[in-house]
Each structure stands twice: as C-alpha cells, then as structure tokens.
A protein has these predicted regions:
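Mixed-charge, low-complexity segments
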Residues: 47-49
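Short gly/ser/thr-rich secondary-structure transition/capping motifs
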Residues: 52-60
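Active-site-adjacent pocket-lining segments in enzyme domains
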Residues: 2-14, 20, 27-45, 60-104, ...
C-alpha cells in the first residue's frame, strides 16, 4: 500500500501554502530520487473546495475517517478554520497525533490546533502567540512552548506562520 500524505483543504484555503510540499513529496527534491508518497486531498464533506486564489480542488476523501494509508496529515491554512466545517477535522488531527504520524499545520490551521488543545505539549509557532491565545482560549496552555520562528518541528508536529511556507515544506520533509 502506497503511503499517503493527506492535505486538508477548506473553502478559501491558501493554495500557495501546499504548493511546494505536495510536489516534493510526490516527485522528490533531487533529480533521480523520486518522491516516496502520494499526495491526497480531503475536505470536510468530500466536496470540491475553492482556494483564496480561485483554484478549485476535488478531494479524494471526506473527513469521516483518517485513511489507514495516511502517513501524514497537513492542515493547509486559509480563511475558514473557525467554521463549523473545520470542527470536523479536530478528531482526525487528534487521531493522527495518537498514531504518531506527521501532523503539519500552517497559518490559521495552527490557530485551529491551538483552539483544539493540540499544541499544548509540543514546541510550535504560529502567526502570533496572541492569536493562538485568542483562538485557543482555555484550550490553549502551550504559550511557554511557543517560538517566534517561521516554522518549528517538534517530533512529528510541524507548525508554521502564514509566511513560512518554504520553511514549512523543509520541516515537513525532515519530519
């Protein structure tokens, strides 16, 4: 069974935040060294979503279950991480963390992780610590583990701020 990296896309996703990682996983980063993964896409209901830039994506999966073949879950940032649709993703992110597979989050998806208490035991970054506290409320107790950097990797968890998409790609590839 081919290993898959599942990219979670919500309406108004930030298409550039996955633009470097997906091809590196699939095609590799060095000539003659092919990638080791298949990039798959998920939306909460399995229906097509549109990016901030107007790119329409048709997902492979809905959020009802995390595929057994999933070797990583990437939460792509965007404008809808506070929506009801986004709430369907929290159990999958928690399951991925329990399985010990890569969980990557960038931009507002990091704030979503804070809001669901998923960053409290790992070093992380985000758009700002103030934003993580605002979104997370009582669920976010990881302020002492926050680092003011473009991207942070702590074990199988990778986080990045909204301008750290290249660093996010690098840290996900190293995780």
């Amino acid at each position: 069974m081919e290993k898959e990296i599942v990219f979670v896309l919500l309406d108004e996703f930030a298409d550039w935040e996955a633009a470097f990682l997906a091809p590196a996983l699939c095609s590799g980063v060095m000539p003659g060294r092919p990638g080791s993964y298949a990039a798959k896409y998920m939306s909460p209901d399995g229906e097509s979503v549109r990016s901030i830039g107007g790119l329409r994506a048709t997902p492979d999966y809905d959020a009802s279950t995390l595929p057994e073949s999933c070797a990583g879950l990437i939460l792509v940032g965007g404008m809808q991480w506070e929506s009801a649709a986004a709430r369907q993703i929290a159990p999958l992110a928690g399951e991925a963390l329990k399985r010990g597979i890569l969980v990557g989050a960038i931009c507002n998806a990091v704030s979503f992780m804070a809001a669901n208490g998923l960053l409290n035991g790992v070093r992380h970054t985000g758009n700002t610590v103030e934003m993580l506290k605002q979104w997370g409320g009582a669920n976010y107790t990881g302020e002492a583990l926050y680092e003011e950097r473009q991207a942070v990797r702590d074990g199988n968890v990778v986080t990045a701020n909204g301008t750290g998409y290249l660093e996010f790609t690098r840290e996900c590839l190293l995780a």
